[in-house]
Amino acid sequence: NAGAVFLCLETISRGKKVIVSRGELVEIGGSFRIPDVMAKSGSILKEVGTTNRTHFNDYENAIEHDTGLLLKVHTSNYSVVGFTADVSLEELVALGAKYQIPVMEDLGSGTFVDFSKYGLLKEPTVQESVAAGADVVTFSGDKLLGGPQAGMIIGKNDLLERIKKNPITRALRIDKLTLAALESTLRRYRNIDREIDSIPTLRMLTLPLAHIETKAKELAKKLENIGDARMSVTLIDLSSRPGGGALPLLKLPSKGVGIKVQGISANTIEKQMRSNELPIIGRIEEDLFIMDLRTILDDELSIIKNALDNMLKKA
């Protein structure tokens, strides 16, 4: 998505000012910062408002003869709460139309799914951005979308044609394997209500707690059947966090299995599991090696059992 944002800015607003709220100057992993990407694109950052409150007149008062873009950035990896105010995309689109300035929204993680239908926190969808009238929308092909890492750009034909003709487009284009993986993912969105389980990210986010608990009990039973008196197995209530720069406030109730082995530290267990032929990633809490069953597939339970069994035999 950083590439998509850069390409849009370089095409639309190079040498011109881009108006953006101070509360939306995001940084994600790898030190990707909106101001830095904007500077590299040749665009000129024009900050408005404050960290927690930005109003419509902040944008309008900042418009000058050399304003090239109104930019709205979804804070997909953090949330500003409390005494806050922001300007909706619809309001920015109306302002852009009044002064004939294009409006771009960077959704960051991006999603086609209304997660509130599944009892999760609402995230703005790509469809909503398009319906609101944004001239250009950028978002990630991975993260909440569930496909390969890629930057996505959708929008109005005139701007997309300019973007496609930019020589930098060829330098940033994805390879054919990534394109094939992306197409395969997007095809599933044609019937997403039926296909949601076929996209691992979405399946894990929407997995019912009862199903997770059943898996946790099954894994605990498999581990107990190893029959090593040194190992204790505990069922644990957990909270899953999506991560990946998305849904920062969401905590999903989940179930986990905690492992403790006499004479072997939790750090050693974690290292051994991570070094397995198929790496097994857990976390450590209170000297327990813990696995969240939300992210473990049904056919992976035996892999975990065999890895622990082999570790115990060598210890």
Question: How should these model regions be labeled?
Answer:
Residues Q100-I101, G141, A171-L177, I192-I199, ...:
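Flexible, glycine/charged-enriched surface loops at secondary-structure junctions
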Residues L7, P35-D36, F139-D142, D193, ...:
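Short, flexible, solvent-exposed loop/turn segments with mixed acidic/basic and small polar residues
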Residues K117-G119, A210-H211, G245-L250, T295-L301:
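Short glycine/threonine-rich loop-to-helix capping motif typified by GTGT followed
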Residues I259-A315:
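PLP-dependent enzyme catalytic core of the Aspartate aminotransferase-like
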Residues D158, N166-P167, I174-E224, D237-S239, ...:
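Structural motif of enzymes handling amino- and sulfur-group chemistry
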Residues M204, L209-E213, K217, I226-Q272:
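Conserved PLP-binding catalytic core of the aspartate aminotransferase-like
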